[in-house]
From Swiss-Prot:
The gene is metG. ATP binds at T345. Monomer. The lineage of its organism: Bacteria, Pseudomonadati, Pseudomonadota, Alphaproteobacteria, Caulobacterales. A motif ('HIGH' region) lies at residues 11-21. This is Methionine--tRNA ligase.
Amino acid sequence: MARILITSALPYINGVKHLGNLAGSMLPADVYARFQRARGNDTLYICATDEHGTPAELAAAAAGQDVAEYCAEQHVLQHDVGRAFGLSWDHFGRSSSPQNHRLTQHFCEVLEERGLIEERVDQMVYSIDDARFLPDRYIEGTCPHCGFDKARGDQCDNCGNLLDPTELKDPYSVISGSRNLEVRDTRHLYLLQTKMADKIRAWIDSHPDWQLLAKSIAYKHLDEGLIDRGITRDLAWGIPVTKGEFPRPGFEDKVFYVWFDAPIEYIAATQEWADEGAGRDWKSWWRTDEGADDVRYVQFMGKDNVAFHTVSFPATILGSQEPWKSVDMLKAFNWLNWYGGKFSTSNKRGVFMDAALEILPPDFWRWYLTSNAPESSDTAFTWEQFASAVNRDLADVLGNFVNRILKFTEGKFDGVIPDGGAPGPLEEKLYADVSARLADLTEQMDAVEVRKSAQALRALWVVGNEYLQEAAPWTAIKTDRDRAAVIVRTALNLAALYARISAPFIPFAAEKIGEAFQLPWPPVWPTTDAAAELSSLPVGLSVRAPEVLFKKIEDEQIAEWTRRFGGAE
């Protein structure tokens, strides 16, 4: 039994996430976690809300709430909507937890002992009208690299370049809109990433199996030359900067930079998980001197998070010289776009997770987002493509097959798996086809190829329809009941198999199919011995057709949703 540690990029606390956030980290991580559990592997899927930094303060101010109260409320909302989508986190933590406070402060102290932290007098943007220093995300302006006029002070969302606020052209305060800004001296701590460049490059070189997207972003930053990164900010909300047990002199009004503490929350959230359950040991997942050397660690994230996870967080982990588990596979995703533009939390552009569930069940969204996962390139969402994927794949292929064979069994065999007859050449051909396709599906799932996995799964659904059409039990029943029994028995086993292999992608519908066959749940991943798998249900078992699994999306609904959410504007 393997041990699989899975983390997905922490969603910001500033509101319910849109479908782009879901598609690029949490959903594919969930699919992978469900697959690994089904294979019997010891699997731990960790996520958390990212609660520090400017987004939290700005969102709380806009909501008229205290920031701590706002974060607590939003954490519950994000947890609940994630669960409603079927996200099977083993723990969904909070970066504001006491565990993350202690661990972040610990890393800073250890890094300083290793000569990788330095106090510097920095020049920061100060807003005269707001009477305060402006952290990165309190400043927007024009990107010096691509000319995008809404670049943030830490990163340009258009070209992806990491920025320093002083690099922005024509900057202004996000708080007041004031351009009455000046640069003043302030003291901050810096992580000396320049000292770690060779070690980070060697570490990335040691992972030749990483996808091109992740490696190309990492090497781009290394080739351009790493910069030392400020890890403290002039903010009130965040993790206090300490020296030993006390506030660090001169840093009493400062906190750690959100991108320093947020990845550390992966470890801290595992501590939270362990603290909440007897017999749980977080160190065996994260400390290689305590058993984590046999863990396979897989991270999921959007491409805009890759730089921080391949440079800054490794600089923290490797620089500490402590035996922490580092990532084995980093799975990055391109962007799911909204009609050619971006989904946007701040601009409320696109469909958000809570609104999505108001109009359709979660499996509809899960299937579309995985079968169209933005892996090799950006993917554009359109209502027409969404409806086509749901109607074609779920309703016409999977739903049609399950409904046809169960209804036929109810009508011709009293809803009982029939005895009689023996498999013939058509079944032998089916066994070979299903075995090969199961092997392909398992291989793609193991490789974390989300889109290819969905394609392999759909191909297996198609096989069932083709078999049923060719075998034609409705014809065989008229002259050869034993032959009809073989076909029905085989097809019912195939439908039960579909429940098991579809569960990582569409868990709610898969469970309904499983209930029709009284399958134990959660399911076990099948072997590639199709002959055995397609004869595993006991003869005489009562089966029943579920309610309509997938109701087709109509043109009128598309028109309504386009009016409500927007579309091809």
